[in-house]
Amino acid sequence: MALLLAGAMLPGCSRPQPDDANAAAGATAEPAPAAAGNAPSEGARENNADAFRFRIGALDAVALKDGDVDAPNDGKTFAIGQPTEQVAALLAAAGAPTDVLHLSIQPLLVRAGERVLLFDTGASDVEWARGGRLPASLRAAGVAPSGITDIFISHRHQDHVGGLLAPDGALAFPNATIHLSATEWAGMEADAEAAALVSAIAPKVATFEPGAELIPGTVTAVVDDGHTPGHSAYLITSGDDRLLYLGDTAHHFVVSVQRPEWTVAYDMDAPLAQRRRRELLQRAADDGTRVYAVHFPFPGLGRFETQGESFVWVAER
C-alpha cells in the first residue's frame, strides 16, 4: 500500500433512528473516553442533530448530516448471497433492527488554518437517499458554501458527489478545488450519466495519484480501491492526532465491520473491496486510529477493535 499509518502499510438510510446511535454504542463494551486532544471544542455545546463539532488535534472539525438510506435485509444490497437469517442474527446481537440496514450520510468539515476542507458532499435530493440537508448543516456549523476551499471526494457515487452542484446546476462550492484520484476522475469522465456533472466541475478538479500527500502534514490519500477503481480513504493529521476518513470502505457499523468479507452490490471489484476493507480495518484496529465513518450512525466517530477473527465498532457517542 502507498501510505504508511504508524509504520504499517495501509491500503465503502431513514431519518435518524434513536436505536441507531444506541446500537452503535451497544455493539461492544462501553467506548473509552476520547483523548484530551480529541475532545470536542468549546463549540460542542452548540451541537445539534445535523452538526457535531469535535477536534482532531489542533483542527476544528464538524460532522455534517446530509441524509439517510434504508436498505432491506434481503441479500440483494448488503451481505450478497448470505442467508437473511444469519444477517438478522448478527444485527440482533448488536441491538440493531433486523429487517433493514440503516445508513447515515455525513460529509466531514475540517478547518485547517486558512483552508476549509469538505470531505464528500452528500447525496443532494435523490429520492432513495432522502438527502439534501448538507446546506442546512453547513449553516449550523457557521460555514458558507463560498468559504469552502477544498473538497476531497472519496469516489463518484451519488451519495458522495451529489452535493457538488446546486439545484440550478451551478457549482455549490464556487471557490473550492475538487480533489479526487486520477483513476476515479477518468471513470467519471467515461460515464455518460455523469456528463453534466463532469462538465460543470472540470475546471475545479485536481487529480492525484494513489497515496499522495495532498496538504502536507494534514491530508494524505489512502489507497483503498475496490469499491470503485479509484476509491480513496483519507488520513487527516494534526500533531500526534489522526483521523481516518473511511469513504465507502465500510457501509454498515455491524455487517461491514464484523463480516468484512461480505460484500455489497455496489462494490465494482468485490474480491478487491473485501481485501481492502479487511486490510484497512485491521491496521486501524492495530494502531488504535480514530475513524470517521461516513455511513455509520451519526456522527460516525469511533474506533475499530479486533474481536476474534473479525472486528467491532466502538462509537465515541
Put a short name on every predicted segment.
Residues L10-G12:
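C-terminal motif of bacterial Sec signal peptides marking the signal peptidase cleavage site
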Residues S14-P135, R139-V143, G147, A172-T228, D240-G247, ...:
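Metallo-beta-lactamase
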Residues R15-Q17, W128, G239-R317:
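Cap/insert and terminal regions of metallo-dependent hydrolase folds
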Residues A58, V110, D120, I148, ...:
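Divalent metal-coordination and catalytic microenvironments
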Residues D66-G67, T121-S124, R156, T183-E184, ...:
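Active-site metal-binding loops of divalent metal-dependent hydrolases
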Residues I105, G113, W128-H179:
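Active-site metal-binding motif and surrounding structural segment of the metallo-beta-lactamase
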Residues I151-V161, D224-H231, Y292-P299:
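Histidine-centered catalytic micro-motifs
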